[in-house]
Amino acid sequence: MSSNSSQAPPNGTPGPFDGPQWPYQAPQSTYVGVAVLMGTVVACASVVNGLVIVVSICYKKLRSPLNYILVNLAVADLLVTLCGSSVSLSNNINGFFVFGRRMCELEGFMVSLTGIVGLWSLAILALERYVVVCKPLGDFQFQRRHAVSGCAFTWGWALLWSAPPLLGWSSYVPEGLRTSCGPNWYTGGSNNNSYILSLFVTCFVLPLSLILFSYTNLLLTLRAAAAQQKEADTTQRAEREVTRMVIVMVMAFLLCWLPYSTFALVVATHKGIIIQPVLASLPSYFSKTATVYNPIIYVFMNKQFQSCLLEMLCCGYQPQRTGKASPGTPGPHADVTAAGLRNKVMPAHPV
């Protein structure tokens, strides 16, 4: 089936808003499988992102400026879950987009808006760590107003690039299995292709470049600190931990957004390309699963957040800690520079 089938259903095939798309697009079992996946994503993402927001509200010590962008990411991911994954769940149960064309446009807009906020939050997070750790601005003090500005930028930038399809520059249409909506990669033409190419550059290439630049310089800074203290085990351990953490962060970003961006670019620039509906749906579902692993990678690995979460879940009781220092909680004689750099990469303390 051609990639533009969402726009022109074959004779005898119900429209995406008219009735079940099985067996025309895929077997009914495929829709059931996707519904199970989306149900799992909705349940898990709602819990983990909700916990991030609630714990951050309840514990003042978590509300340091460097943590604002993490809460911003959790809010964006929760909205993606509510506006995108939950709608997709209902539609896949029914086999078509049951809410109609207007809701399709609204869902496409909201998922694009909050998705762009999420991916740019990861880029701003990397930039903030670079500024704090590498000090390119000298004795710069990262404060609340800087954190708020970073969060505001993600929403303003996302609105700038998610609103045009509502105003005539491209459009939001059913995609893949026709149970979710997104930008019109399929139809072609200068109107759609110019938007897709602009979106690819501004909402994938730019944030990815910023992430790679920031984390590369951060690792070089930490490596230089480790080289000056070759005998300090804590320094060497911090370098290894941060290196692993950065690799996980970058790979998670690519896993989430590379399939979606590549698919959009290929379809937009190759007219008449043949892509099966199931394959066309995969990139969208990859991006939605990020709402589960983003908070796990960026927040739940935070030692101080773990402590506050356990305290909240245990109704104020703090589990006994062993005397052995964990990787995230260096002992009293640990190297201050290494621990400081590590904590600022995955912040646990106010700066």
Curated annotation (Swiss-Prot):
PANTHER family xrefs: OPSIN
Tissues expressing this chain: Pineal gland.
Residues with N6-(retinylidene)lysine modification: 288
Protein's recorded name: Pinopsin
Family annotation (InterPro entries): GPCR_opsins, GPCR_Rhodpsn, GPCR_Rhodpsn_7TM, Opsin, Opsin_pineal, Retinal_BS
Domain of life: Eukaryota
Described function: Produces a slow and prolonged phototransduction response consistent with the non-visual function of pineal photoreception.
Entry's transmembrane regions: 31-55, 68-92, 108-127, 147-170, 195-222, 245-268, 277-301
Protein family per UniProt: Belongs to the G-protein coupled receptor 1 family. Opsin subfamily.
Topology with respect to the bilayer: Multi-pass membrane protein
Record topological domains on the Extracellular side: 1-30, 93-107, 171-194, 269-276
Glycan-modified residues: 4, 192
Organism of this sequence: Gallus gallus
GO molecular function: G protein-coupled photoreceptor activity
Lipid tethering residues (S-palmitoyl cysteine): 314-315
Disulfide bridge partners, by residue number: 104-181
Coiled-coil segments on the chain, per record: none
Sequence ranges on the Cytoplasmic membrane side: 56-67, 128-146, 223-244, 302-351
Post-translational modification: Phosphorylated on some or all of the serine and threonine residues present in the C-terminal region.
Keywords: Chromophore, Disulfide bond, G-protein coupled receptor, Glycoprotein, Lipoprotein, Membrane, Palmitate, Phosphoprotein, Photoreceptor protein, Receptor, Retinal protein, Sensory transduction, Transducer, Transmembrane, Transmembrane helix
A biological-process GO annotation: absorption of visible light
Keyword Zinc (UniProt): no
Protein location: Membrane
Chief localisation class: membrane
Gene Ontology CC terms, in alphabetical order: ciliary basal body; lamellar body; lamellar body membrane; membrane; photoreceptor outer segment; plasma membrane
